[in-house]
């Protein structure tokens, strides 16, 4: 059992549908939801002349359990007419990020639970006044002061220090010989 406004998808007061279904079959609930959303998208109940190639179509007046999982040719035409005649802007226009109600996003389009507070999730750029996001020489979105130890010495090695200009831990230029690809690092 359900109800929805016909062609109400882009009307803030009518973009709604209600479904009450006590079925334990999830597909049946999904079909009922698709049926009501079909009304929101300008689709009427299918008549006898409509065909979806199955036992029953999503917009049939009476759903035939889980077999009603396709929209009919009539429904597809009605949806196309809805788009052409009513030009529903909430469907045809790509919304601005500030117009959507959703989880904030970042570089990978998902904001992780441990999302970085240094970045604005709407722009994926550092927040104003922030210098860095992470690294051994970054704390609370700011570079650590020059001279802060970022890597303790081991053996005959020397401490490495932050330079106050980067989030990375630069290698101490006064270190003894170390090899990388056979060359001496200075």
From Swiss-Prot:
SMART domains registered for this protein in UniProt: DISIN
Known outcome of mutating residue 175 to E: Between 4.8 to 10.4-fold decrease in inhibiting the migration of tumor cells
Q: For the modification Pyrrolidone carboxylic acid, which residues carry it?
A: 131
Which PANTHER family has this protein been placed in? ADAM A DISINTEGRIN AND METALLOPROTEASE DOMAIN (PTHR11905), DISINTEGRIN AND METALLOPROTEINASE DOMAIN-CONTAINING PROTEIN 7 (PTHR11905:SF21)
Protein name stated in the entry: Disintegrin metalloproteinase/disintegrin echistatin
Q: Does the keyword Ligase apply?
A: no
Name the protein family.
Belongs to the venom metalloproteinase (M12B) family. P-II subfamily. P-IIa sub-subfamily.
Q: Which organism is it from?
A: Echis carinatus sochureki (Saw-scaled viper)
Oligomeric and partner information: Monomer (disintegrin).
Tissue note: Expressed by the venom gland.
Q: Which residues form a coiled coil?
A: none
**What more does the entry say?**
The disintegrin belongs to the short disintegrin subfamily.
Upon changing residue 174 to A, the result is: Increase in inhibitory potency towards aiibb3 (2.5-fold) and a5b1 (4.4-fold), and no change towards avb3
